[in-house]
Amino acid sequence: VKHIRPTVEKCLETSLNEIELFEVKCFLLRCHEMLPLFQQVQSALQWEGIGLEDTVQALDLLDPERNRVASFFISDNSSPLLRSLRREKRELEEQIRRLPAGEEREEVQARRVRVASEEELEEMRIRKELSAALRPHVPALLYNTEMIGEIALTVEKARLARRYGG
């Protein structure tokens, strides 16, 4: 599991970019997959203080369709404006492909640049909203990074002990 503590801490102060949101989503997916295993181990071994926080609500923010795949993109369903801008951009791109070189094509290309700029602004607004919505989940995310790190360290110590007869 990739160490994402700096990204999670950054979320407390500012908006995350698309790559950082992807990293957080991947971490949340791993936590979601590991949670039942941690619960089984905790129950079987009666370990206190070892476990993961359930972060499914945070995962649902970044995966509203609940596809549970390691990818991230801001979908058209994120806002009606975004859907409209993307549709308009696709239509303009199709016009550009059909138009011969010349003044009319340049005008359509200029409109496409303006629409793409508006699309980027809307995506930025959505990333800002997603980052703000993740903030209440930051303590659970940080806790889970610590727990996963502790378990990984314990497993490595056990491997070394086995290897060297300890």
Tell where the protein language model's regions lie, with residue ranges.
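Long amphipathic alpha-helical segments that form oligomerization/scaffold cores
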Residues: 39-53, 57
